A protein has these predicted regions:
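Compact, glycine-rich, soluble single-domain proteins
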Residues: 1-84
Length: 84
């Protein structure tokens, strides 16, 4: 069996490739914009930059290499795994 190392997007290391597995949406508090922006399960991503002082993270994702900024709190809802 393959061991999967789960992370939240907010804690994921910069410049490593990852895949979105799903969401931690207890109490249905996850912002709809996460899905509307295309951060869907099975999407491959990479964190390009993490602003200091818990500022936003800049994420590149998908085949078209879309880029967005997410607040750290928004990244708490997204469950990911690291790709080798």
């Amino acid at each position: 069996l393959k061991q999967i190392d789960l992370h939240k997007l907010s804690d994921f290391p910069k410049n490593k490739m990852g895949k979105i597995l799903g969401y931690d949406n207890d109490y249905l508090k996850m912002p709809n914009k996460i899905i509307e922006m295309g951060l869907l399960p099975e999407t491959i991503f990479r964190i390009l930059y993490q602003a200091p002082f818990n500022g936003p993270m800049y994420v590149e994702f998908g085949e078209e290499k879309s880029r967005i900024a997410l607040r750290k709190e928004e990244g708490e809802y997204i469950i990911v795994e690291e790709l080798n």
